[in-house]
Amino acid sequence: MPHFTVVPVDGPRRGDYDNLEGLSWVDYGERAEREDSDGQGNHRENSPFLSPLDASRGNDYYDRNLALFEEELDIRPKVSSLLGKLVSYTNLTQGAKEHEEAESGEGGRRRAAKAPSMGTLMGVYLPCLQNIFGVILFLRLTWMVGTAGVLQALLIVLICCCCTLLTAISMSAIATNGVVPAGGSYFMISRSLGPEFGGAVGLCFYLGTTFAAAMYILGAIEILLTYIAPPAAIFYPSGTHDMSSATLNNMRVYGTIFLTFMTLVVFVGVKYVNKFASLFLACVIISILSIYVGGIKSAFDPPVFPVCMLGNRTLSRDQFDICAKTVVVDNETVATRLWTFFCHSPNLTADSCDPYFLLNNVTEIPGIPGAAAGVLQENLWSAYLEKGEVVEKHGLPSTDTLGLKESLSLYVVADIATSFTVLVGIFFPSVTGIMAGSNRSGDLRDAQKSIPVGTILAIVTTSLVYFSSVILFGACIEGVVLRDKYGDGVSRNLVVGTLAWPSPWVIVVGSFFSTCGAGLQSLTGAPRLLQAIAKDNIIPFLRVFGHGKANGEPTWALLLTALIAELGILIASLDMVAPILSMFFLMCYLFVNLACAVQTLLRTPNWRPRFKYYHWALSFLGMSLCLALMFVSSWYYALVAMVIAGMIYKYIEYQGAEKEWGDGIRGLSLSAARYALLRLEEGPPHTKNWRPQLLVLLKLDEDLHVKYPRLLTFASQLKAGKGLTIVGSVIQGSFLESYGEAQAAEQTIKNMMEIEKVKGFCQVVVASKVREGLAHLIQSCGLGGMRHNSVVLGWPYGWRQSEDPRAWKTFIDTVRCTTAAHLALLVPKNIAFYPSNHERYLEGHIDVWWIVHDGGMLMLLPFLLRQHKVWKKCRMRIFTVAQMDDNSIQMKKDLAIFLYHLRLEAEVEVVEMHNSDISAYTYERTLMMEQRSQMLRQMRLTKTERDREAQLVKDRHSALRLESLYSDEEDESVTGADKIQMTWTRDKYMAEPWDPSHAPDNFRELVHIKPDQSNVRRMHTAVKLNEVIVTRSHDARLVLLNMPGPPKNSEGDENYMEFLEVLTEGLERVLLVRGGGREVITIYS
């Protein structure tokens, strides 16, 4: 959280100005006791230097402390008014907000909007756990361990978990790069990669979530019909080959029934789904804990689940009870049911027995030997099977011979061909669900903190569970039981349930409810994702799915989701649906990593993630891993998924989604540049994509050398913005005569740019007047979308001493041009004191004085400077001014929130400026400014006299300011010898001999001038702000502050220059910043 303090600023010190006729000192101590105080010891607006009319204007009379900025308040508001709007910020989308307001309007009263209140645990960690743990853990992980072996199973888990962990790191960077409104992962991807990629990936994520609902429903049906209620099956096999088809048909019928019921539940109300979410999560946690307890118990008291073996083949034990060929009953050997199945007759002399049955012995082995039995070593290695192959145990004696084909149904056989790649595709859905936290971003109290911490902790937790489960299963369960997918060899028990304590039913019931809950969650989330895509209107034919019920529920999207999920139900095989699901999720994760890598490599100014533990190499590794997993698990599914995504991309591009969200080689570069420039012509960039495109206006000396090369140094230190840099200059004269001179100047500037490491372009124009040439550069530099949006302009040093008013007229006219063109303006003052690229500031501060808000340039520039090695170690401080009517405490809170969302690390200080009286010093300085202005216009001074006059004024100002700012205590008795007198006073004038050749007839009127009221107020603003700034920032490495706009009336231009001089007096390095009238920094992702 940013550090902030409140600094009260006292009024100016008392001085002795008795030589000013008609002025008297205002005693603040006495006036505070009078009726014209505000009751808190603060002086009212009354002043001997302002007319009562101005003081009585009330709200129309703007704060005297900020009078310099009063002409532009409509476009550059006070900071306090901007910060107040942050309190009403909401994460809700527009439609949801309107719906909430409509609901809260019942009875004519609006309820207060409920603020997001979820923390990391409830908002991210537990939902991620619930979405990651799913049907694969309970139904397929044991089979995967038995088939791939412990070592390869650990490798599969490691690859999949690394993929999601790397994706979570990339996602955390994107999610913390600004406020993520309700919309989650789709919002992040689409706003990072643009509408084409966003739409394609969004639809892939939607299809993945929809097929996830189908997978969870199929898992629930498998648990129901296999372990809970097998008699509930509708279809039964009529022959040996009808077993699989009967199972699939049962899955289709019951799956459709379950899907219809769940869709109705979601349609009736999501609140019911959310209410049961905690119950479903509890089922998952209890089931997992029972597995661990059972594993520990098996070490000293293994559960009894015997497995019947014929030779080394595993028998399906759901059709017989006694594991023997014959039994002795009443001293008579009788055939068992097992004999009857293999010999098709209870007669012990039957000659139609299966040869393998006759030649091999029937034995019984423990299905759960326990952790102390040493089966881990046997289960280390893989045992991949082809479809229809019998599950065998290595090490048991067996006489190999061909058995009868009819007997195959009596063994435990593989229902699908298995390999490492197949298992990767089946297991990957068990690590998906990492987006659950970001999908709830609108409900989180602090999404930028909760999403990274909660998601990564959930992935670490689930990964540890998977790793430990693989080792636990391999150490406790017999290999043939592990390879028995449906538990046929252990009397049709769920294999993982055989290990659980106290009963297999804990796992059976828990896994059933957890899969049902996960299915409901998927059916709830997928329609909302489709609705978000439809509302963005990037895919026109999906527009209808953006509408819903009156309460905003996505009815049409839910209907489409149910129809697509039905396609997954009709596939009817969990092992076939899982790879499809993997493809869509891997596609989504691939583009999340791509988005992070692209943003990191481009280093756009808006890329400021609060989560710091990311790197483009990690994102690239995650992207490569996703792509590899897609082709490893199922190359043809991967191609289909990529074709679908590509078709969606081209369709959105073809439709022209106008959304704002982001030698031979030379010929190729030219073609690419032309294509890029044409694409950039669409309009101004989105705030997130804004970066400073600089036009640096240089002044050349008589030898065509750059007069202030540090302007180029400063521009190079802003190169972290990765924007365009154009360096321009003007040669005064005729183009026909000065063309060669312009070419030479251009080459000189290019050489200097190379020395200062400025990457950009140079343009020198020839014009009859410098100000016209500068106006041409401002208007015409750049090409297409690659145009400058910011102008760097040098300060006109020595304007006071110059006998030519064009010295400062050119400067002010250029300021007006940039304002008219809606360009930002940067004016580095005292540029000679700016650091070179070889210097390093090992400590210090960059101080930002945020007086009025004009687009956020003041915030963005220090961030860009601190990316450069010169300024890297400097810390950022932001000062803002609170007036008497501002709530400074609330401003502190709002500013802290604002900076947090901007992802800027800075100390914050709120400076309280009381509306004190305008001091005699201010009045005198204004008077002298106006007198000097008139004198220089009226008197025909020689150059020597004018230089002396300007130097005297400058010396007097500097001495007076130093005395005022750095005196520790007030001096009540200032002697006459210590007084600083005006250059032109009544006494001085009367004492001098009259010479009509040196003075105008109306000079005697100058000493009777009363300064303009608005000039007094503006001078008061400059003096007060300068006192505060020098007091707080005199030791800062750089001070940035708002540059007041020039007066609308050009007659006050010279006074405007004086105001700027007073405002920046006593500061070593100042950067005056004037925004271009648009936002350049945003809190959004």
Swiss-Prot record:
Amino-acid positions noted as binding K(+) in the UniProt annotation, renumbered to this chain: N131, I132, Y216, P429, T432
Main location group: membrane
Binding-site residues for ATP, renumbered to this chain: L697, K699, K707, Y708, V730, G794, W795, Y797
Positions on the Cytoplasmic side per record topology: 1-119, 173-196, 441-450, 532-554, 599-612, 652-1085
Modified residues (Phosphothreonine): T983
UniProt binding sites for chloride 1: G433, I434, M435, Y589
Transmembrane segments: 120-141, 150-172, 197-225, 249-271, 272-297, 420-440, 451-473, 505-531, 555-575, 576-598, 613-635, 636-651
Record entry for activity regulation: Inhibited by WNK3.
GO molecular function: ATP binding; metal ion binding; potassium:chloride symporter activity; protein kinase binding; protein serine/threonine kinase binding
Region of interest: Scissor helix: 665-681
Residues binding chloride 2: Y589
Record field: catalytic activity: K(+)(in) + chloride(in) = K(+)(out) + chloride(out)
Ranges per topology, Extracellular: 142-149, 226-248, 298-419, 474-504
Disulfide-bond pairs as recorded: C308-C323, C343-C353
Gene3D superfamilies: Amino acid/polyamine transporter I (1.20.1740.10)
Cellular compartments per GO CC: membrane; plasma membrane; synapse
Modification sites for Phosphoserine: S24, S47, S51, S81, S88, S734, S916, S967, S1050
Protein function: Mediates electroneutral potassium-chloride cotransport when activated by cell swelling. May contribute to cell volume homeostasis in single cells. May be involved in the regulation of basolateral Cl(-) exit in NaCl absorbing epithelia.
PANTHER family in the cross-refs: SOLUTE CARRIER FAMILY 12 MEMBER 4, SOLUTE CARRIER FAMILY 12, CATION COTRANSPORTERS
Protein name: Solute carrier family 12 member 4
Organism listed in the record: Rattus norvegicus (Rat)
High-level lineage: Eukaryota, Metazoa, Chordata, Craniata, Vertebrata
Gene that this sequence comes from: Slc12a4
